[in-house]
A protein has these predicted regions:
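Double-stranded beta-helix
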Residues: 62-112, 211-236
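Residues at beta-strand starts and edge strands
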Residues: 14, 32, 69-70, 163, ...
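A short beta-strand-loop-beta hairpin characteristic of the jelly-roll/cupin
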Residues: 16-46, 168-195, 233-235
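Conserved short histidine dyad/triad with adjacent acidic residue
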Residues: 1-24, 139-171
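Intrinsically disordered, low-complexity linker/propeptide segments enriched in Ser/Thr/Gly/Pro
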Residues: 1, 16-17, 72-76, 166, ...
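Conserved metal-binding segment of the jelly-roll/cupin
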Residues: 41-65, 187-214
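Short Gly/Pro-enriched loop/turn and capping motifs at secondary-structure junctions
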Residues: 23-25, 58-60, 80-81, 172-174, ...
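A short, N-terminal "cap"/entry segment at the start of jelly-roll beta-barrel domains
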Residues: 1-6, 86-155
Length: 236
């Protein structure tokens, strides 16, 4: 198997792991098999999923047991550095261990000819967000080749009370830096245009957008991440 994380580790911040298949007709299929261990319990799945690990919770190894076709994987955490905690600071889950407290499968909404939402973390009513106290806000979606030219995804300039990452990722494993699309986005009123795999960082309270998908030659992954979704705000 392909080993993503060989050893059991824990971190002083919440971690987010995302695994998304590229079968656009069956968005919940990973097209491979994943093994993910949390607090000594192994979870094996062949489905698109998002795994949230609370701070100081030991996890790993993480392995890809099988790949039927390329799939997308991403990890992030609420910290500037990724330094493992010493074992004396590890915290084991209390009570009965249930994977559904940590794993979220495909739950996208609002699919249309332009975009296909696959996963979302949005709002304190989500069982994972409720357990962890609102660690992340995020949406993961594909933009299709059927996206109309000059498709306006976000029409107005706005800001948030939290920093935001806006990520545009290629789906071609042999050409990962070529986005296969052209994007136009404004930051503080200044317009940028790019056609490469790109991460845009919008600091808290900094105006950003409009965001326009100018053209799409092949599907690409777009996802946003912000900390602390319970205080998510949208300020014009």
């Amino acid at each position: 198997p392909c080993v993503i994380e060989a050893e059991e580790k824990a971190y002083a911040f919440d971690m987010l792991y995302v695994f998304v298949g590229q079968d656009f007709e069956n968005q919940n299929e990973l097209c491979g098999e994943l093994s993910f261990t949390i607090a000594g319990h192994e979870y094996v799945t062949d489905k698109t999923c998002m795994i949230l690990v609370p701070k100081n919770t030991p996890h790993g190894p993480i392995r890809v047991n099988r790949v039927d076709q390329p799939f997308f994987t991403y990890c992030g955490g609420a910290s500037k550095e990724r330094v493992p905690e010493s074992r004396d600071r590890w915290v084991m889950p209390e009570g009965e261990f249930r994977f559904e407290k940590y794993v979220l499968h495909g739950n996208g909404e609002d699919n249309n000819e332009a975009e296909q939402e696959v996963l979302r973390l949005h709002g304190s009513d989500n069982k994972i967000i409720g357990d962890f106290g609102g660690v992340f806000y995020g949406k993961f979606r594909w933009f299709r080749v059927t996206t109309p030219k000059d498709f306006i995804f976000a029409a107005e300039s706005h800001s948030h009370g939290q920093p935001e990452l806006l990520n545009f990722y290629s789906t071609d494993p042999d050409d990962p830096y070529n986005l296969g699309a052209t994007i136009s986005m404004e930051m503080m009123g200044e317009r940028y245009e790019f056609d490469q795999t790109t991460t845009v960082f919008a600091p808290a309270n900094q105006p950003h957008c409009p965001l326009k998908i100018m053209s799409v030659e092949r599907p690409f992954m777009f996802f946003t991440l912000m900390p602390d979704c319970k205080v998510y705000s949208l300020d014009k």
